[in-house]
A protein has these predicted regions:
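Composition-driven recognition of glycine/serine/threonine/acidic- and proline-rich low-complexity segments
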Residues: 2-214
């Protein structure tokens, strides 16, 4: 699915855009159930993590109190064969997890088991023709979160949270984010966001908070 041309069309079709992003890798049914909601209906702490016009990398690091690392799960094949877009499925991980914000009290002897936990799931589609070659190369290298790359590149950019979603994860999500398909992930929330570079829409993102499942 190509990048939407205007903010209005993106807003009107946010759910379709999310479905298209997910289906770049698997049927939506295996991912879970996704429902568009109003941002005022998102409970804490999800609201502060999602309902903003900023990079999720920054939000996650502030929330968990530690820098996050990137894991590229999968890269979608370039169907057009022209390498004009780059789509990948990712996880953000942190050695520190803010369980308390989710109402969980971690015991000291549990800390080693929680090292490098998944804090965010995401899918991103990038129009690579609209970014400097060195930025694209760094993104495709897969070693640094996207938000950090764009910040360090000092590009004129606008992050826009277009629509938020309630997510009821399926077994795939549990296995990927918690390491066990038998361990249910609680109801969580995500967002569809866009990033414009020099007023041109360049990036689409589906970003889902991974809550504590203790």
């Amino acid at each position: 699915m190509s990048m939407a041309d205007t903010n209005t069309s993106i807003n009107d079709n946010a759910a379709d855009c999310v479905q298209a992003l997910i289906e770049s890798f698997r049927p939506v049914e295996t991912f879970g159930t996704i429902r568009a909601i109003d941002s005022k209906d998102i409970p804490a702490p999800f609201h502060s993590l999602l309902a903003h016009h900023s990079h999720m990398t920054v939000a996650m690091e502030a929330f968990h109190g530690h820098s996050v690392s990137l894991e590229v799960v999968s890269v979608a094949p370039d169907e057009a064969g022209e390498r004009t877009s780059y789509t990948r499925e990712i996880l953000l991980r942190s050695p520190v997890f803010n369980d308390k914000a989710f109402g969980i009290s971690s015991q000291p002897d549990e800390i080693p088991k929680k090292m490098n936990r998944v804090v965010q799931y995401g899918i991103v589609r990038i129009n690579t023709n609209c970014l400097p070659q060195e930025v694209v190369a760094r993104i495709e290298d897969g070693g640094t979160p996207l938000g950090r790359i764009l910040i360090e590149a000092d590009l004129h950019r606008e992050v826009r949270c277009v629509r938020v979603f309630e997510v009821m994860p399926g077994p795939y999500f549990g296995e990927l984010c918690l390491g066990s398909e038998n361990k249910a992930v609680p109801r969580t929330f995500g967002r569809f966001a866009t990033i414009s570079i020099s007023e041109q829409p360049v990036i689409e993102l589906f970003e889902v908070v991974v809550p504590s499942a203790e």
